[in-house]
């Protein structure tokens, strides 16, 4: 819940001096990216900018405090301020900020700018007290903000010092409007206006100018002069002499003498007690100070000129001038030290009553009241956890004694979930084990089950599926239905374990249950995770169309719940890329993989390994070996600088081994085979994949017998577990083994099986990647004219893809090849005496590649009748009568030229 006063522009008071010369300068702020107002405390930065902002509707105001160094809090308020300025235009960014569903501040800002691209009027955002920001991550994000904000957007920053926002660069590019302390200092005319409005008796212009010079135009000093003159009934000039040459560091003594010591005891205590509040309203004042009418007291303090300012148009929220507030808090620690804990307790209670638990925690921590802090956490910690207030929770839990956590074990559970969210898996188990050992009495069964659900999640994350399954089952046996979050966790883990074990049907059922529970209770990250798992299972089962449709539901969920910047979004676009690659939609697959890399742009490069693997796959399917090699260099560098799940390693090894196959690099394959551990099982898709990599390397090295043993066992496992996509891949690799070892009949048999299974999977690129050996076999099958219609259509599609992407592999008789052929000593005499034209050579190459007449016409962009003429001419020149004769003739020419076909 956001505090309204932090998003309210200060109210312009009637007795303030209108700074016309500075307002004129600010009037051109819309021509700059950044308007920067800097000066020490008390020079009137906020007052000036609030005057300038008056009447501007499309302006957001964000007043900072120390707590805004938390990235999530900063993001929430900043987006809320822009929403106020735009009337709710940036709803997606607002939802992402509220739900903490973004990868980083920069990625959230990138989404914000996408929405602001449709906003065409001038827009302003004021950030007050930016000097309070010390978090370098926020500084980096705001530099990004300034670089990429729309042209019609102006950021206005108020700060006591020069902020770390790339100021020099903006200044050089004339994108910075600056107002500093010298310009903010009152001139003689402004000082005269100020005293005329504040003092009951006017003073001469010369005296006013002299006092202005004495304090170097410092607005706070002028205000103190007027206040002191009114309180002490002395001349303003007397106060000015005391303030001459004073600065903020020596102001405390003056404020004690001239302000605190000149108010009655009741007002003094009111000032000191209320100063602990960063912002205040009637209810807070009543509780903290004991005054009966807090609103009336606040307005009275404001009228006395005691540095209290309204924070909103309604007059409900107030705050002290930062300089005076800081002074009062320091004095409160000295003068009311014994009462201070009780004052903070009262503040915490009032904030709780108004629904601001994070502010209440701030005061409970300041009070050192562990019992109050514990009670707040017991009632509100999980809500704060779900809103990613992780830093505040961690600080709070550290402030509680261990004994208090043991007495309230759900707080131990919360601390463990905090550790899990930070991937501190070993610490989670250590903490839970210690708690179980030291909790007095019999531990509640439900709590024990919640511990086990968390342990199960840690175990599966840490690559221990057996332990994860045991713990998940224990948790589900004991958890009541009402404990929905832990049940969602345990059900999800159990489903993931069954997926790893190859029990796809049961795993799919559990993931569907997880989705239903997660949607019902608005646990959106588990709903998304379950959909991703369902899609992977359906892919493994060979139901790629069903996997596609499940992915569509996941994309819709991401859109509806604004989950675009969760790392899981990368998982989804990656498995979409895998599916698109299988269907030979290579451009879309590549775009999807690149979007996955973009999602992870703020994470460690190692996280991008899977998407990079897919980019290599796309290059290999296109036959672009140079590009594949470049991408592989980066991939292999990442492999050497990280620890990865076996699934990631299997996918990375796959593209490496295929590349070695396509380039004939037996040395690299042999070295990899020597050092690669062989998995103990092959009961899921990633273990099947790694065994397939091993078999492919063995085939490349001519080790046909061990490769055949591997593939036959893989097929047996795949059939028993219904891993139909893996079976399709295994059959294709077995086909290559039979083809290269001269067992043509066996090769044809398994190829027919693979084509039939592809009617279910839709595979195209898995065939294409095998290149010319696959093309030759498909040509022969097409020529036999015995394939069923669907298999015939798929075979022709695969041939077109091979011809398009692997044309350098003999499918095209280009000019260089023809020239070498005609100069060959064994070229048939008929071709010498009646040579083919270049177009006729092209047609012969396409016939050899399995193209029909219509497809050849489309490829060469000529009429079908023209193709028939070319075919008739080349048949006559070659002395053949049928298409199959022409294919055989082309094959003989290729063999003569030394190509192994």
Curated annotation (Swiss-Prot):
Regulation of this protein's activity per its record: Activated by ATP and maltotriose, which are both required for DNA binding.
Keywords per UniProt: Activator, ATP-binding, Carbohydrate metabolism, DNA-binding, Nucleotide-binding, Transcription, Transcription regulation
Presence of keyword Transcription regulation: yes
DNA-binding region: 853-872
Residue ranges of domain HTH luxR-type in the record: 829-894
Pfam hit, one: TPR_MalT
A GO molecular function held by the record: ATP binding
Binding site for ATP: 39-46
Protein's job: Positively regulates the transcription of the maltose regulon whose gene products are responsible for uptake and catabolism of malto-oligosaccharides. Specifically binds to the promoter region of its target genes, recognizing a short DNA motif called the MalT box.
PANTHER family according to UniProt: DNA-BINDING TRANSCRIPTIONAL ACTIVATOR DEVR_DOSR (PTHR44688:SF16)
Subunit structure: Monomer in solution. Oligomerizes to an active state in the presence of the positive effectors ATP and maltotriose.
HAMAP family with a match to the protein in the record: HTH_type_MalT
Protein name: HTH-type transcriptional regulator MalT
Organism: Salmonella typhimurium (strain LT2 / SGSC1412 / ATCC 700720)
Taxonomic lineage of the native organism: Bacteria, Pseudomonadati, Pseudomonadota, Gammaproteobacteria, Enterobacterales
């Amino acid at each position: 819940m956001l505090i309204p006063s932090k998003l309210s522009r200060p109210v312009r008071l009637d007795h303030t001096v209108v700074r016309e010369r500075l307002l004129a300068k600010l009037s051109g702020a819309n021509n700059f990216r950044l308007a920067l107002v800097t000066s020490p405390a008390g020079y009137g930065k906020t007052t000036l900018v609030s005057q300038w902002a008056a009447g501007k509707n499309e302006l957001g105001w964000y007043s900072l405090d120390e707590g805004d160094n938390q990235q999530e809090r900063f993001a929430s308020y900043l987006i809320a301020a822009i929403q106020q300025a735009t009337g709710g235009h940036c709803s997606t960014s607002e939802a992402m900020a509220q739900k903490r569903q973004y990868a980083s501040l920069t990625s959230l800002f990138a989404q914000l700018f996408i929405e602001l691209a449709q906003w065409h009027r001038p827009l302003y955002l004021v950030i007050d007290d930016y000097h309070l920001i010390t978090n370098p991550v926020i500084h980096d994000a705001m530099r990004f903000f300034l670089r990429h904000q729309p042209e019609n957007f102006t950021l206005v920053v108020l700060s006591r010092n020069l902020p770390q926002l790339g100021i020099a660069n903006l200044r050089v590019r004339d994108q910075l409007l600056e107002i500093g302390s010298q310009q903010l200092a009152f001139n003689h005319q402004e000082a005269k206006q100020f005293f005329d409005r504040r003092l009951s008796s006017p003073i001469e212009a010369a005296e006013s100018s002299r006092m202005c010079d004495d304090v170097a135009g410092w607005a706070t000093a002028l205000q103190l002069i007027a206040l002191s003159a009114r309180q002490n009934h002395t001349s303003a000039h007397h106060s000015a002499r005391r303030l001459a040459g004073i600065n903020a560091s020596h102001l405390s003594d003056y404020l004690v003498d001239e302000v605190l010591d000149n108010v009655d005891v009741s007002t003094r205590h009111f000032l000191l007690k209320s100063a602990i509040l960063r912002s205040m309203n009637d209810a807070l004042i009543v509780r903290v100070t004991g005054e009966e009418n807090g609103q009336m007291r606040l307005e009275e303090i404001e009228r006395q000129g005691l540095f209290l300012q309204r924070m909103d148009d309604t007059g409900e929220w107030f705050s002290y001038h930062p300089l005076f507030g800081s002074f009062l808090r320091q004095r409160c620690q000295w003068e009311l030290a014994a009462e201070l804990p009780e004052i903070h307790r009262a503040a915490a209670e009032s904030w709780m009553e108004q629904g601001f638990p994070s502010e209440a925690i701030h005061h409970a921590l300041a009070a050192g009241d562990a019992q109050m802090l514990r009670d707040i956490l017991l009632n509100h910690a999980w809500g704060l956890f779900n809103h990613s207030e992780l830093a505040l929770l961690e600080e709070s839990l550290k402030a509680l004694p261990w004994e208090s956590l043991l007495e309230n074990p759900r707080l131990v559970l919360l601390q463990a979930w905090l550790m899990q969210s930070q991937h501190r898996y070993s610490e989670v188990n250590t903490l839970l084990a210690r708690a179980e050992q030291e909790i007095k009495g019999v531990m509640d069964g439900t709590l024990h089950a919640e511990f086990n659900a968390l342990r199960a999640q840690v175990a599966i994350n840490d690559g221990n599926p057996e332990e994860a399954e045991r713990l998940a089952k224990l948790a589900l046996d004991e958890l009541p239905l009402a404990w929905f979050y832990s049940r969602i966790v345990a059900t999800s883990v159990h489903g993931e374990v069954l997926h790893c074990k190859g029990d796809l049907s049961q795993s799919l059922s559990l993931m569907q249950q997880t989705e239903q529970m997660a949607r019902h209770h608005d646990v959106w990250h588990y709903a998304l995770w379950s959909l991703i798992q369902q899609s992977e299972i359906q892919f493994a089962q060979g139901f790629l169309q069903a996997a596609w449709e499940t992915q569509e539901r996941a994309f819709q969920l991401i859109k509806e719940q604004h989950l675009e910047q969760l790392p899981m979004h990368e998982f989804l676009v990656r498995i979409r890329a895998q599916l698109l690659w299988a269907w030979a939609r290579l451009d879309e697959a590549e775009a999807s993989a690149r979007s996955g890399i973009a999602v992870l742009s703020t994470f460690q490069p190692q996280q991008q390994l899977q998407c990079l693997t897919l980019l290599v796959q796309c290059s290999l399917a296109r036959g672009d070996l140079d590009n594949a090699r470049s991408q592989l260099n980066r991939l292999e560098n990442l492999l050497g600088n990280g620890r990865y799940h076996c699934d990631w390693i299997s996918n990375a090894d796959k593209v490496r081994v295929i590349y070695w196959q396509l380039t004939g690099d037996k040395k690299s394959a042999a070295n990899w085979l020597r050092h690669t551990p062989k998995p103990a099982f092959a009961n899921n898709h990633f273990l099947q994949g790694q065994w397939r990599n091993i078999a492919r390397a063995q085939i490349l090295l001519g080790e046909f017998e061990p490769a055949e043993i591997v593939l036959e066992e893989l097929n047996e496992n795949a059939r028993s577990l219904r891993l139909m996509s893996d079976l399709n891949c295994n059959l294709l690799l077995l086909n290559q083994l039979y083809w290269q070892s001269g067992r043509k009949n066996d090769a044809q048999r398994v190829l027919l099986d693979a084509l039939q299974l592809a009617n279910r999977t839709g595979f195209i690129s898995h065939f294409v990647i095998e290149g010319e050996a696959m093309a030759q076999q498909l040509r022969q099958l097409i020529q036999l004219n015995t394939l069923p219609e669907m298999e015939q259509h798929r075979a022709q599609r695969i041939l077109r893809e091979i011809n398009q992407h692997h044309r350098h592999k003999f499918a095209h008789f280009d000019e260089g090849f023809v020239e070498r052929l005609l100069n060959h000593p064994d070229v048939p005499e008929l071709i010498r005496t009646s040579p083919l034209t270049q177009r006729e050579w092209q047609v012969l190459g396409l016939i050899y590649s399995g193209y029909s007449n219509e497809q050849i016409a489309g490829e060469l962009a000529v009429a079908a009748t023209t193709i028939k003429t070319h075919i008739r001419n080349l048949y006559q020149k070659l002395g053949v009568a049928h298409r199959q004769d022409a294919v055989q003739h082309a094959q003989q020419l290729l063999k003569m030229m030394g190509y192994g076909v």
